[in-house]
């Protein structure tokens, strides 16, 4: 069985995946995000790359740290940072989890450029103090010609992000190849 994961190369490095070929469809690059986090009580990481590109891990010791799901929590754990995750991974589950922290908390959301605003919009609507920092960007490749043949024998293609799915269907998809698709969220599934 041939399984292709389209996750960016520098994410989930801590997970050993046997029998899964990683073929990234975009790169991640660092964005400068110098920020004093001393005034924040709660820090939310929206993705594994937001953890990996964050410059202030040592300053999280006295903060309430939240992760969007188990992958992001694992990434924080490899850096020695304890975090809470929702019972149901994703924005809706996280809203329920952070509801009790809203009153007196000041939130910092760490995410990639162009990342979802669902949590920040929710916190603002609830009257919370919230700031967002974008510490990485997703960069499309200039061409997909050379990697498209790597998908010809894929039984399954995994999409960890909507961008990966968009790129795949715009640049690589061949209706003559009978691959099945796996998504990590209902939002990506709805797109696929």
Residue positions per predicted region:
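Signature of uroporphyrinogen-III synthase
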Residues: 1-192
């Amino acid at each position: 069985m041939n399984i292709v994961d389209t996750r960016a190369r520098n994410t989930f490095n801590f997970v050993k995946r046997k029998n899964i070929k990683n073929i990234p469809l975009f790169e991640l690059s660092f964005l400068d995000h110098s920020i004093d986090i001393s005034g924040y009580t709660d820090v939310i990481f929206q993705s594994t790359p937001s953890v990996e590109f964050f410059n202030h891990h040592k300053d999280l010791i006295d903060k309430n740290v939240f992760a969007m799901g188990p992958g992001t929590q694992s990434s924080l754990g490899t850096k020695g940072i304890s975090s809470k995750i929702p019972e149901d991974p994703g924005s809706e589950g996280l809203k329920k989890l952070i509801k009790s922290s809203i009153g007196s908390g000041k939130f910092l959301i760490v995410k990639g450029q162009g990342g979802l605003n669902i949590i920040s919009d929710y916190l603002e609507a609830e009257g919370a103090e919230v700031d967002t920092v974008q510490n990485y960007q997703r960069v499309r490749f200039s061409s997909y010609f050379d990697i498209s043949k790597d998908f010809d024998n894929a039984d399954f293609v995994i999409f960890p992000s909507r961008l990966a799915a968009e790129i795949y269907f715009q640049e690589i998809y061949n209706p003559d190849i009978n691959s099945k698709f796996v998504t990590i969220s209902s939002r990506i599934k709805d797109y696929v």
